[in-house]
């Protein structure tokens, strides 16, 4: 019986060894699968990290593009407002230039009139009133006279027609205005024609 017990035990032992080998093989196989899964997992994580980095870069690029587009729209809006403002201010430029000879002629008529003649006096008063009203109306639209007599010569506002020696005036001073200049909303549309002291 002891032999039989030994035999059974040997058979059982063989069976246990066989099962242990199977378990070890299964464990090795499972370990290999786990390693493979771990490698796949690491590869997938690396792939996902790369995709995330790429997406973050794209988002940043898109945000930069949106900011640039907003800035461009703001600049365009500002330029358009400035152009509209400039167009409003200087829309009357050509019209104002055409009115200047009318003002000049009214002033010449006032200067040339004989103030002693009683017949002409009422006409002269009418011309003076017309001139004053006309100048006041165009001033409402930004047309302003440049009459620099006695001021320092400024080439931005004055056009020197002649330069003469004068003991009564400082050098580079406007002695005489031959024709008044005009500006429209701060922009010179006709410089004053002047005689300058040397």
From Swiss-Prot:
Main location as per UniProt: cytoplasm
SUPFAM superfamilies: Coiled-coil domain of nucleotide exchange factor GrpE, Head domain of nucleotide exchange factor GrpE
Family annotation (Gene3D superfamilies): 3.90.20.20, Head domain of nucleotide exchange factor GrpE
One term under GO cellular component: cytosol
This protein's UniProt keywords: Chaperone, Cytoplasm, Stress response
Presence of keyword Kinase: no
A biological-process GO annotation: protein folding
Localization per record: Cytoplasm
Transmembrane segments: none
Molecular-function GO terms, alphabetical: adenyl-nucleotide exchange factor activity; protein homodimerization activity; protein-folding chaperone binding; unfolded protein binding
Keyword Amino-acid biosynthesis: no
Subunit record text: Homodimer.
NCBIfam families, per database record: PRK14139.1, PRK14140.1, PRK14150.1
Family per record: Belongs to the GrpE family.
Function comment: Participates actively in the response to hyperosmotic and heat shock by preventing the aggregation of stress-denatured proteins, in association with DnaK and GrpE. It is the nucleotide exchange factor for DnaK and may function as a thermosensor. Unfolded proteins bind initially to DnaJ; upon interaction with the DnaJ-bound protein, DnaK hydrolyzes its bound ATP, resulting in the formation of a stable complex. GrpE releases ADP from DnaK; ATP binding to DnaK triggers the release of the substrate protein, thus completing the reaction cycle.
Name of the protein in question: Protein GrpE
Species: Vibrio parahaemolyticus serotype O3:K6 (strain RIMD 2210633)
Gene designation per UniProt: grpE
């Amino acid at each position: 019986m002891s032999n039989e017990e030994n035999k059974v035990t040997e058979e059982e032992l063989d069976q246990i060894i066989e099962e242990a080998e199977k378990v070890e093989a299964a464990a090795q196989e499972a370990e290999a699968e786990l390693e493979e899964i771990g490698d796949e997992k690491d590869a997938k994580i690396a792939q996902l990290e790369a995709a995330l980095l790429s997406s973050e870069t794209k988002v940043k690029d898109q945000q930069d593009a949106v900011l640039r587009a907003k800035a461009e729209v703001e600049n365009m809006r500002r330029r358009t407002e400035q152009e509209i403002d400039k167009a409003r201010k200087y829309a009357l430029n050509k019209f104002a230039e055409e009115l200047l000879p009318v003002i000049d002629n009214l002033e010449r008529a006032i200067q040339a009139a004989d103030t002693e003649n009683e017949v002409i006096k009422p006409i002269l008063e009418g011309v003076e009133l017309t001139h004053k009203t006309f100048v006041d109306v165009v001033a409402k639209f930004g047309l302003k006279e440049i009459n620099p007599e006695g001021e320092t010569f400024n080439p931005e506002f004055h056009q020197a027609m002649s330069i003469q020696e004068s003991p009564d005036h400082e050098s580079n001073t406007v002695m005489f205005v031959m024709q008044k200049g005009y500006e429209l909303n701060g922009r010179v549309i006709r410089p004053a024609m002047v005689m300058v002291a040397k």
